[in-house]
Curated annotation (Swiss-Prot):
Other observations noted: There are 73 peroxidase genes in A.thaliana.
Comment on bound cofactor: Binds 1 heme b (iron(II)-protoporphyrin IX) group per subunit.
Cysteine-cysteine disulfides: C35-C116, C68-C73, C122-C318, C201-C228
Cofactor(s) it depends on: heme b; Ca(2+)
Keyword tags: Calcium, Disulfide bond, Glycoprotein, Heme, Hydrogen peroxide, Iron, Metal-binding, Oxidoreductase, Peroxidase, Secreted, Signal
Enzyme nomenclature, EC number: 1.11.1.7
Protein name as annotated: Peroxidase 41
Binding site for heme b: H194
Record gene name: PER41
Native organism: Arabidopsis thaliana (Mouse-ear cress)
Length: 326
C-alpha cells in the first residue's frame, strides 16, 4: 500500500448557494434539436483527456461541487479574474482546483462552438462532463438534466463560508450542506467522492506535524510524514485521498475510514462522529447502497441554484462573461 501512497502529483483538486427547484426547461433532451451531437462531443472529448491525465475525473468532480455550492451550478467558478474583479477561482479555498478540470471544459466548449455555436452553456458542459468522467472511472451512472444558463457574477470574497474545509466538524459541514438543501446522509454520500483524487499536504499537515494524530494509522502517518516533509517549500506535494484504490470510484474510501486511513480531518470525523458513523458503516459494507445514494445526491447537486434565461446567459468563452461585469 505504501508504494501507492508514495505516488506524488505535481498539480493543482471538495461550493455555495441556496438550493432551488430546476426551472421548467431543465430537461434531459434540452439540446436534441439545437445541438444534437452534444452528448457525443462531450463523451469523445473527455475520453482521451482522462486517458492522458487520469486525475481529470477527480478534478472535474471537485470543480463541479465547488461551482454548485457557490451560488448555484452556473459556471461562476470558471470565470477568470480581471483588473476589475477577483473571481471565485482565485479565492484561497479554490487555489488548488486542478488545471485539468478547467482544461476539459475549455476543450468541450471549443468543440461545441464549432458544431453549434452559442447554444450550449458552460454550466451544462461541466455537469455533463462530470457525470461522464465519474462513470469512466467506475462510478454510478446518474441522469443529468440540461438547460442551465451561465451566471453573471463571480466574486472571490463570497466564497468563504460556502465551502467545507479540510478540518471542519460534522455540524459545521452540515450547516453548509443544509444551506443547499442536503441532509446529513447526503453529506456522507457526497463525501464519498473522495474515493478518487488527492489533497495537498498543507490540507492535512496538522495531522502529522509536529505530532502525529494518534487516530491516524501509524504506517500511513509515516508515509505521509516522509511525503510531506518539504511541503512548506514545495507546495505541489500531495497524497491520494484513497491510498488503496486511488484511481477507481468505489466504496474503499469508507473502508479506509474504519482503518484510520482517512487523509483529511474532515474525512476521519465522519467515522468518529456518532451521527455520521452509521452511514460510513453502511457504505463500507454495501457499495450498491453508496452508489445509489451518491447518484441521487449528484442529481440533486446539479439542480442547486440553477440559472434560467432571465438571470443567465450562454457564454461565448467559459472564463469570461459576454459583457464586462465589475
Amino acid at each position: 500500500m505504501s508504494s501507492v501512497i508514495n505516488v506524488l502529483f505535481v498539480v493543482l483538486v471538495f461550493v455555495p448557494s441556496i438550493y432551488s427547484a430546476p426551472p421548467p426547461n431543465l430537461t434531459k433532451d434540452y439540446y436534441q434539436k439545437t445541438c444534437p451531437d452534444f452528448n457525443k462531443i462531450v463523451r469523445e472529448t473527455v475520453t482521451p483527456k482522462q486517458g492522458q491525465q487520469p486525475t481529470t475525473a477527480a478534478g472535474t468532480l471537485r470543480l463541479f461541487f465547488h461551482d454548485c455550492f457557490m451560488e448555484g451550478c452556473d459556471a461562476s467558478v470558471l470565470i477568470a479574474t480581471n483588473s476589475f474583479n477577483k473571481a471565485e477561482r482565485d479565492d484561497d479555498l479554490n487555489e488548488s482546483l486542478p488545471g485539468d478540470a478547467f482544461d476539459i471544459v475549455t476543450r468541450i466548449k471549443t468543440a461545441l462552438e464549432l458544431s453549434c455555436p452559442g447554444v450550449v452553456s458552460c454550466a451544462d458542459i461541466l455537469a455533463q462532463a462530470t457525470r461522464d468522467l465519474v462513470t469512466m472511472v467506475g462510478g454510478p451512472f446518474y441522469e443529468v438534466k440540461l438547460g442551465r444558463k451561465d451566471g453573471f457574477e463571480s466574486k472571490a470574497h463570497k466564497v468563504k463560508g460556502n465551502l467545507p474545509l479540510a478540518n471542519q466538524s460534522v455540524p459545521d459541514m452540515l450547516s453548509i450542506f443544509k444551506k443547499n438543501g442536503f441532509t446529513l446522509k447526503e453529506l456522507v454520500a457526497l463525501s464519498g467522492g473522495h474515493t478518487i483524487g488527492f489533497s495537498h499536504c498543507k490540507e492535512f499537515s496538522n495531522r502529522i506535524f509536529p505530532k502525529v494524530d494518534p487516530e491516524l494509522n501509524a504506517k500511513f502517518a509515516g508515509v505521509l510524514k516522509d511525503l510531506c516533509k518539504n511541503f512548506e517549500t514545495n507546495k505541489t506535494m500531495a497524497a491520494f485521498l484513497d491510498p488503496v484504490t486511488p484511481g477507481k470510484f468505489d466504496n474503499m474510501y469508507f473502508k479506509n475510514l474504519k482503518r484510520g486511513l482517512g487523509l483529511l480531518a474532515s474525512d476521519h470525523i465522519l467515522f468518529k462522529d456518532p451521527s455520521t458513523r452509521p452511514f460510513v458503516e453502511l457504505y463500507a459494507n454495501n457499495q450498491t447502497a453508496f452508489f445509489e445514494d451518491f447518484a441521487r445526491a449528484m442529481e440533486k447537486l446539479g439542480r442547486v441554484g440553477v440559472k434560467g434565461e432571465k438571470d443567465g446567459e450562454v457564454r461565448r468563452r467559459c472564463d469570461h462573461f459576454n459583457k464586462l461585469n465589475v
